[in-house]
């Protein structure tokens, strides 16, 4: 029986949470919070999360599975959170004290819709004693499951914590890049989903690789401008946490945000797309939140791609007309 003394809990059992558990359990014992008892029983029986990442074999001897969130938070000093952004309030609003002096590593890639807060702002508002960091791509859960060479970006300002997390995340297939740009890394992980969605819309409309290359180049330029408007820090987006994550999310067939957009471009309604995918595409809600963030600081005029995405998703604007308008702006 494993000794669960590694002091790490993972919260969330979707594709990304499962991939993170798969990586960590190669190196340490850990605690894994899963919402439903039935899902826990299935994971123990099959050694796989058959609902979200069925090809990923899990070493369940090294994983303590539980539906008890309070226990998961009390058991560990390092809490890795991999849930959809809109679940955060339900999970943590009433558990602020349990997070005191914990290190939170967010793998969340969206904005909390009802408050328009990023995960970083939400957690630090909830409990100021938290040490906060971000784990991001470029990395798809599906390729982790296939043991393909992948790179993760770890952004945190504490050197000792950074070294510990680098050690437990590093495997033969997973390499870690270190950053101290916590805010920028998180914002970029949110923004790239919006840009992947609009790329998907273009693909669904029948645009080819030639156009998509120009569109994604324009997305990269806009991402850099928007990052600076939201967090006034000079940064080069040529690093993998920014440009690399944007590229893989816009181009990959694994990208749920690209798939979401492709359905919209092909003529599906929002509701039909959600029903067909049966997965959370963070770019949908993030488009709404980012549009209003940028509108508040009078920057939306400098973000025509985000504005077009908002018009398509929330103003019932014709996708073909919006992409045609964008094509004239970026040419």
Go through the PLM ranges and name each one:
Residues 58-60, 66-74, 78-148, 165:
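Rossmann-like NAD(P)(H) cofactor-binding subdomain of soluble oxidoreductases
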Residues 111-209:
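Rossmann-fold dinucleotide-binding core
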Residues 1-57, 62-67:
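NAD(P)+-binding Rossmann beta1-loop-alpha1 motif at the extreme N-terminus of oxidoreductases
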Residues 149-154, 183-228, 239-259:
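Active-site-proximal catalytic alpha-helix in oxidoreductases
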Residues 14, 18, 37, 66, ...:
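Electropositive phosphate-/nucleotide-binding environments in soluble metabolic enzymes
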